[in-house]
């Protein structure tokens, strides 16, 4: 089964074969990127616009690199100097972008649902690069690809997601994806940072780090999202690390071959110790960044082919 949807707005609602199709295509691009070969004809003559209403380094750069490696004309729109900063509404922005006839629109916005709204108003294929606390689908895909490359599978693995789950769109997308593909997901954090309805998602919830990490195959750490927090959710960063920071002693509770992940940006000494983050064997944080480019190439490829009604193919 190919990925034949007009947009990528969320992981929730995708069928497992669609997810596997994107992961398989991304694996092909990961191998292509490591070989030094290019696929610059695929999006030649197509325009990709990165529209980021929130600051981003990794995601925007990753999409830009993915587009350029496929031959697209890539435009990065700076919201701080655009008409949006002068009071233009999101719908007016959509109308303006539609008049430009771009082919692919990558959107990051502080409000949940903004990419969905744009997808209803523009002719371009829209990719959600993170919307509020809702979802971040390409991050979940790159995380899944990284896990699959190290573990050979996703089904049957125990994945511990630790930290500020309440405000994390990354956590939500990962929960939907991992549960869909047969992983057992654990959420670890203080009660103030775990969603109240988490039990409805088919996950296990732990408020004790040692218990939650016991026997885990994958440990995924999340940063404290101070910019989205109300005051009083955690007493202090020092206290937070004392109970929920990942150090070598806590990591020993997981399986000996457990891998360490983090979507970035990292706050060293708050949610993760430097020695753990930089572990040359178990940390796959740098590989996550690498797989991000491959995943975004796969998503751009799949959406562009869907718009052109071209048959799916693997890069060579």
Curated annotation (Swiss-Prot):
Alphabetized UniProt keyword annotations: Pyrimidine biosynthesis, Transferase
Q: Which domain of life is it from?
A: Bacteria
Q: Which cysteines are joined by disulfide bonds?
A: none
User: Does the record carry Translocase as a key word?
Assistant: no
Report the InterPro entries cross-referenced here.
Answer: Asp/Orn_carbamoyltranf_P-bd, Asp/Orn_carbamoylTrfase, Asp/Orn_carbamoylTrfase_sf, Asp_carbamoyltransf, Asp_carbamoyltransf_Asp/Orn-bd
> Binding of carbamoyl phosphate: at which residues?
58-59, 108, 136, 139, 264-265
EC main group: transferase
Catalysed reactions listed for this entry: carbamoyl phosphate + L-aspartate = N-carbamoyl-L-aspartate + phosphate + H(+)
Give GO terms for biological process. Answer: 'de novo' pyrimidine nucleobase biosynthetic process; 'de novo' UMP biosynthetic process; amino acid metabolic process
Q: In which pathway does it act?
A: Pyrimidine metabolism; UMP biosynthesis via de novo pathway; (S)-dihydroorotate from bicarbonate: step 2/3
For this UniProt entry, the molecular function terms from Gene Ontology, in alphabetical order, are:
amino acid binding; aspartate carbamoyltransferase activity
For whether the record's keyword set contains Transferase, the answer is: yes
* Gene3D superfamilies reported for this sequence: Aspartate/ornithine carbamoyltransferase
- What Pfam families has UniProt attached to this entry? OTCace (PF00185), OTCace_N (PF02729)
| UniProt subunit comment | Heterododecamer (2C3:3R2) of six catalytic PyrB chains organized as two trimers (C3), and six regulatory PyrI chains organized as three dimers (R2).
What is this protein identified as?
Answer: Aspartate carbamoyltransferase catalytic subunit
The species this protein was found in: Granulibacter bethesdensis (strain ATCC BAA-1260 / CGDNIH1)
């Amino acid at each position: 089964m190919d990925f034949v949807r007009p947009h990528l707005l969320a992981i929730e609602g995708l069928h497992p074969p669609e997810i596997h199709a994107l992961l398989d295509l991304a694996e092909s691009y990961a191998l292509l990127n490591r070989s030094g070969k290019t696929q610059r004809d695929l999006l030649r003559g197509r325009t990709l616009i990165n529209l980021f209403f929130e600051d981003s380094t990794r995601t925007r750069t990753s999409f830009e690199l993915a587009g350029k490696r496929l031959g697209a004309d890539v435009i990065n729109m700076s919201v701080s100097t655009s008409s949006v900063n002068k009071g233009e509404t999101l719908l007016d922005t959509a109308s303006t972008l539609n008049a430009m006839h771009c082919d692919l629109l990558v959107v990051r916005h502080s409000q949940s649902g903004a990419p969905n709204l744009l997808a209803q108003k523009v002719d371009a294929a829209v990719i959600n690069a993170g919307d509020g606390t809702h979802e971040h689908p390409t991050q979940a895909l790159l995380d899944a690809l990284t896990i699959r490359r190290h573990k050979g599978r996703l089904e049957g693995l125990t994945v511990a997601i630790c930290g500020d789950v309440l405000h994390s769109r990354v956590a939500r997308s990962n929960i939907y994806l991992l549960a869909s593909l047969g992983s057992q997901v654990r959420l670890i954090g203080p009660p103030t940072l775990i969603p109240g309805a988490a039990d409805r998602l088919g996950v296990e919830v732990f408020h004790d780090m040692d218990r939650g990490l016991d026997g885990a195959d994958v440990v995924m750490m999340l940063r404290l999202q101070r910019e989205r927090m109300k005051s009083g959710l955690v007493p202090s960063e020092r206290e937070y690390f004392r109970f929920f920071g990942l150090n070598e002693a806590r990591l020993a509770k997981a399986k000996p071959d457990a891998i360490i992940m983090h979507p970035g940006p990292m706050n060293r000494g708050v949610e993760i110790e430097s020695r753990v983050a930089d572990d040359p064997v178990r940390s796959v944080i740098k590989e996550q960044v690498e797989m991000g480019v491959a995943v975004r190439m796969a998503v751009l490829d799949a959406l562009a082919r869907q718009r052109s009604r071209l048959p799916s193919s693997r890069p060579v």
